[in-house]
Structure formats: structure tokens, C-alpha cells
Amino acid sequence: MPSPGLVMESGQVLPAFLLCSTLLVIKMYAVAVITGQMRLRKKAFANPEDALKRGGLQYYRSDPDVERCLRAHRNDMETIYPFLFLGFVYSFLGPNPLIAWIHFLVVLTGRVVHTVAYLGKLNPRLRSGAYVLAQFSCFSMALQILWEVAHHL
């Protein structure tokens, strides 16, 4: 339950952002854990000392599935970090709470679907569509932030 201070300052928007952004950060942690597990399962270690500890230098190598996990994680960093900034600032612009919820849920859903589609090697169109939807929502927030800033110059 959000504190009364958060609700008074920003209506229902900031708590909605905090919920969605926290879930996205947890999702990023999950991808990091999946990457580590994939390294162990495939015996593909990024550091020679890890390979030596796990059986020998022959395991100091790359693996396509590990690389896929790393790309998913990098894509998360390229998209979720900007959302954390944009969503936070957007929360204080006084947006309509329903519209803000939609923005945040579109990003959350898009990023989860993108990750599942990418790691699961599902249809690339599904992955691309999820990516575009999440980015569209971020772009919308960015434009609204710029609009508000321009009106206060």
C-alpha cells in the first residue's frame, strides 16, 4: 500500500509507475539468473578462472544460447533504463491516471512478452511487436515531457 504522501503528491500515477518499474527490475534480475544458469548448463564460461573451476579451460567459450540471454539482457538495459527515467518524470506531470496506467502497463507487458519471445525463440514478429509497443509508450511519455518543458521555458 503506497504511503499517503505518495498518493497526495501524484494521485495514483507514481504508485502505478513504482509497481511497473519494480516488476521490470525484477524481470531483469530473472534474465540475469537465467543467463547464469544457462552458462552452467552449457558449460560456457566468460572467464578462464570460472572455466578452470568448472572443469577446465575448454569451457572458456561462448555458446549461442548464452549469447541469446546476454542479448536479451542488453536489450532490457537499452529499453528499461530509459523507461525508468521517462516514467518517473512523467508521473509528476499530472497525467490522467488511466492514461498513465496504460502507458506503464504497455511497457511492462511489452518487455515481458519481448523477453519470453526472445529467450523462447518464438516468432520474431511477436518479439518485434512487443518491442515497438513498449517503445511507442516510452516515446509518447518523452513527447509529453518535452511538451511540458517547452511550455515552461
From Swiss-Prot:
Activity control mechanisms: Activity is increased markedly in macrophages and osteoblasts following pro-inflammatory stimuli.
A matching Pfam family: MAPEG
Highest taxon of the lineage: Eukaryota
Expression triggers: Induced by pro-inflammatory stimuli and down-regulated by anti-inflammatory glucocorticoid.
Family annotation (InterPro entries): MAPEG-like_dom_sf (IPR023352), Membr-assoc_MAPEG (IPR001129), MGST1-like (IPR040162)
E.C. number(s) listed in UniProt: 5.3.99.3, 1.11.1.-, 2.5.1.18
Keyword terms: Cytoplasm, Fatty acid biosynthesis, Fatty acid metabolism, Isomerase, Lipid biosynthesis, Lipid metabolism, Membrane, Oxidoreductase, Prostaglandin biosynthesis, Prostaglandin metabolism, Transferase, Transmembrane, Transmembrane helix
Topology class, membrane: Multi-pass membrane protein
BP term (GO), one: sensory perception of pain
Site (described: Essential for protaglandin-E synthase activity): D50, R127
Cytoplasmic side: 43-61, 121-124
pH dependence (UniProt free text): Optimum pH is 8.
Subcellular location: Membrane; Cytoplasm, Perinuclear region
Recorded catalytic activity of this chain's protein: prostaglandin H2 = prostaglandin E2; 2-glyceryl-prostaglandin H2 = 2-glyceryl-prostaglandin E2; prostaglandin G2 = (15S)-15-hydroperoxy-prostaglandin E2; 1-chloro-2,4-dinitrobenzene + glutathione = 2,4-dinitrophenyl-S-glutathione + chloride + H(+)
Essential cofactor(s): glutathione
A single GO cellular-component term on record: cytoplasm
Keyword Zinc: no
Membrane-spanning residues: 14-42, 62-91, 97-120, 125-153
GO function term, MF aspect, one: glutathione binding
Main localization, broad class: membrane
Lumenal side: 1-13, 92-96
Gene knockout outcome: Deficient mice are viable and fertile and develop normally. However mice display a marked reduction in inflammatory responses and reduced pain sensitivity. PTGES deletion results in a reduction of PGE2 levels in the central nervous system in association with the impaired LPS-induced febrile response.
Function in brief: Terminal enzyme of the cyclooxygenase (COX)-2-mediated prostaglandin E2 (PGE2) biosynthetic pathway. Catalyzes the glutathione-dependent oxidoreduction of prostaglandin endoperoxide H2 (PGH2) to prostaglandin E2 (PGE2) in response to inflammatory stimuli. Plays a key role in inflammation response, fever and pain. Also catalyzes the oxidoreduction of endocannabinoids into prostaglandin glycerol esters and PGG2 into 15-hydroperoxy-PGE2.
UniProt record similarity statement: Belongs to the MAPEG family.
Quaternary structure, from the entry: Homotrimer.
Protein name: Prostaglandin E synthase
Organism: Mus musculus
